[in-house]
Amino acid sequence: MPSFDIVSKVDMQEVDNAVNQTIKEIAQRYDFKGSKSEITQEKDTVKLLSEDDFRLKAIIDILQSKFIKRGISVKALQYGKVENASGGMVRQIITIQQGISKEKGKEINNVIKETKLKVQSQIQEDQLRVTGKNIDDLQEVIQLLKGKDLGVELQFVNFRQ
């Protein structure tokens, strides 16, 4: 039976490249001269530290533009609260979402079932597998999910016949 998997993955090498480009741009920009702004990346998080909210927002804008240029969806970013740090600084932690959560998996599952197409979908850890007898039905599901805004970036992989 034909099937495909729905996943939500982010290329961490591209994230690393985008963060490094952002660091370089901050070092060169005139409005950041003499400011104490820094970005650090650890596994699935990016920590932003700056002197005030204005500069923090500017760093986020730069980071988002670099993500977009590198082909990473900004839907994969989950922004934490802006916190006060020591020395009058402000901090924000951005988490990079990998995989599809159980709640999002159920939501996608319901969207697929509402179509009344002859396909089955199963939640498998952080991905969904969709199977059906007809390839056209599977392609219709892909088009439907591409058109919906589910809050996560979806990739369709492992298409088998």
UniProtKB/Swiss-Prot annotation:
CDD domains membership: YajQ_like (cd11740)
Database matches in InterPro entries: DUF520, UPF0234-like_C, UPF0234_N, YajQ-like_sf
Signal peptide bounds: none
Keyword set, alphabetical order: Nucleotide-binding
Pfam families per record: DUF520 (PF04461)
Organism superkingdom: Bacteria
GO molecular function terms listed in the Swiss-Prot or TrEMBL record: nucleotide binding
GO cellular component terms attached to this protein's record: cytosol
Sequence similarity: Belongs to the YajQ family.
Task of the protein: Nucleotide-binding protein.
Protein name: Nucleotide-binding protein Gura_0717
